[in-house]
Amino acid sequence: MEIAATELVLKNASVAANYASQARQLDPSNGYAAIMLAQAYAEGATACEGFDRQTVYWLAYDILASARSLFENGSPEQQQIDQTMSMFRRSFPSNDELFFRGLTTAGAAYDVKCGWITGRTTVKMVE
């Protein structure tokens, strides 16, 4: 995890994501690895533009949502996750954008493709 954190500070988001993903695979209960992976995705999203960039935040949001349950209720980690999830929600595509792309069903499967960031998530409507 220290290597992932260092790589993230050095703006090597893809390398950080790789290490965080490996740590998460070795220990799925490691909430810190999930947080680091979500942060790396958010940092890496800057390499893309427009809609592709925005959908990365769906994926990062999902990762944080799964990490949230790994921490004690009301813990500082949960509070930080909640703040970050709120920030990510503000970066989601607008409902108008989703409509124009034919993505009108919240919860429908969606494959994110933004440079080195790929993954399956679901369409999330802005509340």
Model-derived segments and their meaning:
Residues 90-127:
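N-terminal alpha-helical interaction modules that lie
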Residues 5-11, 38, 43-52, 86, ...:
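Short coil/turn linking the two alpha-helices of tandem helical-hairpin repeats
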Residues 17, 21-25, 52-90:
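TPR/TPR-like (Sel1-like) alpha-helical repeat modules
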Residues 1-2, 32-36, 80-83:
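Alpha-solenoid helical repeat scaffolds
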Residues 31-32, 75:
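Helix-start (N-cap) detector for alpha-helical repeat units in TPR-like alpha-solenoids
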Residues 1-29:
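Alpha-helical adaptor scaffolds
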